[in-house]
Amino acid sequence: MNQEKNREPLGLNGLPSHDYFLDAVNHIDQAVTNKSIAIGAAKGIIYSITETLGSMIGDPDLPSHLRSAYEGALEVAHELEAKIARLN
């Protein structure tokens, strides 16, 4: 069943809500748990997500409310990255 979530659309600055990143991390977490993704692929995707979030957080023009939300998403991604590393 596909449930519609209330997500913030792209903001006026063109940046996505942190929910999109959290959804991606949760999707990879579920795939790893269900063993429906190769560990190497999961590592690569999570690496890309953490690098993207890190770059966005490093932007000095990023509004503080977005920075805080992205930092939270980055922390969740780092936790999954550590979980995947323990599986290897």
Regions picked out by a protein language model, each given a short descriptive name:
Residues M1, I84-N88:
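Short intrinsically disordered terminal tails
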Residues T33-A41, G58-H65:
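Charged, low-complexity interaction regions
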Residues N2-G40, L80:
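N-terminal acidic leader/helix
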Residues K43-Y47, S64-G72:
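Short, charged, amphipathic alpha-helical segments
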Residues I28-V32, L53, I57, L74-A85:
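A structural signal for well-ordered alpha-helices, especially hydrophobic packing surfaces
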Residues N2-E8, S55-G58, S68:
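Long, low-complexity or tandemly repetitive, helically biased scaffold regions used
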Residues A41-D59:
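Short E/K-rich amphipathic alpha-helical oligomerization segments
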